[in-house]
Swiss-Prot record:
This is Defensin-like protein 141. The gene is LCR3. It is found in: Secreted. One of its GO terms (cellular component) is extracellular region. The keyword Transmembrane helix does not apply. The keyword Cytoplasm does not apply. One of its GO terms (biological process) is killing of cells of another organism. Belongs to the DEFL family.
Length: 78
């Protein structure tokens, strides 16, 4: 009986912490910037974005006719 109560307590505690983390991530605004100084390569794009804005770089193609572009997604506060 005691083990199940302790287990339930920890599960509720962990779920509460997860909800707080998710809410914090949703409140944080995301900005984006096209990094034109490099050709789009997955490693290059991500490395430059991380160095420049502490963000996540991805190669994207907005329309089928466009070339791949390096887009940097980062928290607006940085």
């Amino acid at each position: 009986m005691t083990k199940s109560i302790i287990s339930a307590f920890f599960i509720i505690l962990i779920l509460g912490m997860m909800v707080n983390e998710i809410e914090g991530q949703q409140q944080q605004q995301r900005c984006e910037e096209a990094l034109t100084e490099i050709d789009c390569g997955a490693g290059n794009c991500n490395a430059l974005c991380l160095q420049k804005r502490k963000g996540l770089g991805r190669c994207v193609q907005r329309t089928p006719c466009d070339k791949l572009k390096c887009m940097c997604y980062y928290p607006c506060s940085s």
